[in-house]
């Protein structure tokens, strides 16, 4: 039953329609009890061997006007192209470094000792978190470039307002990938010039300055090729999208307890996900 709902995508109503003689409330109760039994077991994750990279992202919820964040973590072997998800953690309040400290503290010690890097969005306190543990910090390219885009009818498109904004997007994209040398130096100088002048909205100007300030962390994957760092958190975000779809179709995310229960079971059914760090256009 769990596999058909959490992996095959059936809803309880669809499965119930094929079970004559059973009332729907009783069927839902049986399913919840099966979920509880499954989640109460020892976590089934097998930590990959060798040096590891920690991938992390948060999934936001709101209950009765109060923010909650489901913290997702996965471990990728430096020489591998897949990530193994750990059990999620749900904490009340906005996403931040203090709560990420709690999440990191829950990682099994035998895995913690082998983590050499972390890939995250550019959130306040992440530099300190990485430094405290002696980890290389790789900031997500996708989130950075997304700040230079906007939404229109569900699709991303480059912000309008003149060719300068398009130039900034192109320059930053190149600066994320170019090796050290004169071409990169010229691009960075141009970005510094634009950050001091009229480069569109204040938000875009701030994004350029933040990028220049954290440049080494966006380019960590180039400085540490032996770590096999992905330069996005896309694999973790893919899990987040799957969870959102599951909550939508099952209508199971009505309260914090339900979110954590279903998310834990869902992730345990899908422990591994491909992690390639695809390029961003």
Stretch-by-stretch model annotation:
Residues 1-2, 24, 263:
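Short, leucine-enriched amphipathic alpha-helices that occur as contiguous helical runs
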Residues 1-11:
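Short, amphipathic alpha-helical "recognition" segments used to contact nucleic acids or chromatin
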Residues 110-116, 120-132, 163-281:
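Acidic/histidine-rich catalytic cores and adjacent linkers
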Residues 133-156:
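Inter-helix linker motif
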Residues 11-21:
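DNA-recognition alpha helix
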Residues 69-70, 150-162:
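Short, surface-exposed amphipathic charged segments that create phosphate/polyanion-binding patches used
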Residues 20-117, 124, 128, 136, ...:
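RNase H-like nuclease fold core
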């Amino acid at each position: 039953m769990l596999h058909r709902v959490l992996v095959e995508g059936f809803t309880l109503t669809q499965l119930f329609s094929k079970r004559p003689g059973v009332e729907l409330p009783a069927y839902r109760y049986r399913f919840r009890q099966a979920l509880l039994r499954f989640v109460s077991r020892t976590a089934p994750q097998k930590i990959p061997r060798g040096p590891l990279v920690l991938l992390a992202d948060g999934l936001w919820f709101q209950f009765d006007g109060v923010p909650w964040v489901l913290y997702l973590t996965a471990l990728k072997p430096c020489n591998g192209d897949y990530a193994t998800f750990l059990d999620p953690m749900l904490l009340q309040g906005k996403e931040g470094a203090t709560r990420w400290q709690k999440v990191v503290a829950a990682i099994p010690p035998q895995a913690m000792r082998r983590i050499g890097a972390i890939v995250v969005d550019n959130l306040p306190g992440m530099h300190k978190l990485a430094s405290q543990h002696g980890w290389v910090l790789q900031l997500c390219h996708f989130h950075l470039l997304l700040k230079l885009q906007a939404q229109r009818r569900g699709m991303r498109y480059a912000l309008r307002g003149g060719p300068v904004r398009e130039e900034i997007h192109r320059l930053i994209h190149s600066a994320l990938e170019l090796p050290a040398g004169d071409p990169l130096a010229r691009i960075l100088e141009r970005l510094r010039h634009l950050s001091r002048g009229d480069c569109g909205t204040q938000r875009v100007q701030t994004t350029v300055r933040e990028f220049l300030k954290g440049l080494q962390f966006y380019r960590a994957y180039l400085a540490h090729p032996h770590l096999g760092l992905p330069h996005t958190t896309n694999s973790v975000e893919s899990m987040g999208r799957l969870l959102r779809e599951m909550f939508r179709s099952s209508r199971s995310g009505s309260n914090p307890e339900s979110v954590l229960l279903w998310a834990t079971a869902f992730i345990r059914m899908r422990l591994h996900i491909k992690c390639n760090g695809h390029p961003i256009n």
